[in-house]
């Protein structure tokens, strides 16, 4: 009996539980649909290490992504000066807000907001809170140059901290002109981490061939967004990318390869000889990736508010910031004096700042804080806290 051909495409690799490995794989029949009769016995996996030695592994699970399977999405937003033209920034914000509102309705989904101009800004770490995500999107304003590669590199590093289905979706309206990281740096890191990059380009200044090549090399795709109705075009593209990722199957196996876990391997996923289907796909990955969450080669600012110890900030100035940035700026004042933190996002963030040294536990510092802070700092902390209260910041419910 002739076998039914299948088209296989490995979009991403989750190696967070290595030696157990999960391949997020598009499995489609000739009609473009995922067959309903898939099971693990119909597939085989063979790993090839850097020396060419081959090691078979048993496929333990082949299942479509269920509604409850978590997705981790890093949404990268261009805030360079060219985004001022034709209300592109407003349209991009509307589309991004609409997307995250829908995305977080699925239990387990989380997103992070990254924006960029000359610098890269972590506007909001991964969360399922629509309020925090929309606050981050609202805080983005256009100015400066276009450090797209830095932003993508940063987003890959941050997304690599998550387990499960992971994807970076970037929006850009101009050509890269300000990054420390190179195109090859981004492609290499995407391939190392197994995280795909999808890119949406808008306007005539976009280098389409370069971005298409980048997205393709990163197992993603490139989209053109019509600028005449940008908000609607972006909403449709974001939904298409989301649907594409949700159409994947999880192919799970446990590696038997004894080689170096830091060297690139090739995994061959094939339909088994005894099964009803025919098809195969190879994919390279690195079993264990030691990737920092915040890399110093990326241009990011040392302080949220560098002069909060010498300037009184008005409410109108501070209200332009996202809830995460307010929370960060308030705790940045404490961090300058050596306070430690219980919140893991704060701990991760300040650990990358060369100026930061923890001197006190949170409890020790809170007992003496009134004598440590000057008048500017005390007033700024009070104003930030009042704004956070008025905006019902979820961060007020978390450990500092």
Regions found by a protein language model. Give the residues of each.
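C-terminal "exit" segments of structured domains
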Residues: 14-19, 216, 223-294
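Acidic, polar low-complexity linker/tail segments
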Residues: 10, 15-74, 79-88
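Exposed acidic/Ser/Thr-rich ligand/metal-binding surfaces
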Residues: 71, 77, 88-93, 97, ...
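Short, glycine/polar-rich helix-capping loops at beta-to-alpha or helix-loop-helix junctions
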Residues: 204-213
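Proline/serine/threonine-rich low-complexity linkers at boundaries of modular beta-sandwich domains
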Residues: 1-4
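Compact alpha-helical subdomains of small soluble proteins
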Residues: 341, 348-400
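Acidic/histidine-rich, surface-exposed loop or edge segments in extracytoplasmic proteins
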Residues: 26, 73-81, 116, 303-315, ...
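Amphipathic alpha-helical packing elements
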Residues: 317-358
């Amino acid at each position: 009996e002739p076998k039914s051909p299948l088209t296989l495409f490995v979009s991403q690799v989750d190696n967070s539980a290595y030696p157990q490995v999960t391949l997020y794989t598009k499995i489609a029949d000739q009609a473009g649909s995922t067959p309903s009769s898939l099971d693990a016995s119909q597939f085989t996996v063979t790993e090839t290490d850097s020396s060419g030695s081959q090691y078979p592994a048993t496929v333990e699970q082949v299942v479509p992504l269920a509604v409850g399977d978590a997705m981790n999405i890093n949404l990268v937003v261009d805030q360079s000066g060219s985004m001022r033209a034709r209300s592109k920034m407003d349209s991009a914000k509307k589309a991004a807000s609409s997307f995250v509102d829908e995305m977080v309705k699925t239990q387990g989904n989380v997103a992070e907001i990254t924006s960029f101009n000359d610098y890269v800004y972590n506007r909001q770490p991964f969360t399922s809170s629509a309020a925090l995500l929309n606050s981050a999107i609202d805080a983005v304003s256009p100015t400066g140059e276009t450090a797209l590669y830095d932003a993508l590199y940063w987003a890959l590093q941050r997304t690599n901290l998550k387990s499960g289905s992971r994807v970076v979706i970037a929006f850009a309206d101009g050509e890269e002109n300000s990054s420390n990281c190179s195109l090859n740096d981004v492609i290499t890191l995407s391939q190392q981490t197994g995280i795909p990059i999808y890119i949406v380009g808008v306007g005539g200044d976009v280098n389409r061939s370069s971005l298409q090549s980048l997205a393709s090399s990163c197992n993603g795709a490139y989209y053109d967004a019509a600028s005449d109705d940008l908000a609607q075009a972006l909403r449709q593209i974001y939904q298409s990318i989301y649907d594409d990722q949700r159409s994947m199957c999880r192919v799970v196996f446990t590696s038997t390869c004894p080689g170096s876990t830091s060297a690139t391997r090739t995994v061959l996923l094939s339909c088994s000889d005894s099964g009803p289907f025919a098809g195969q796909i190879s994919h390279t990955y690195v079993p264990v990736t030691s990737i920092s969450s915040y890399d110093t080669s990326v241009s990011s600012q040392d302080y949220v508010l560098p002069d909060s110890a010498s300037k009184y900030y008005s409410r109108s100035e501070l209200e332009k910031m996202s809830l995460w940035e307010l929370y960060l700026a308030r705790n940045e004042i404490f961090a300058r004096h050596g306070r430690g933190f219980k919140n893991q996002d704060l701990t991760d963030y300040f650990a990358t700042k060369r100026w930061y040294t923890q001197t006190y536990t949170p409890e020790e510092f809170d007992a003496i804080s009134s004598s440590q802070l000057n008048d500017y700092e005390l007033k700024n902390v009070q104003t930030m806290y009042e704004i956070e209260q008025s905006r019902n910041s979820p961060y007020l419910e978390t450990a500092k």
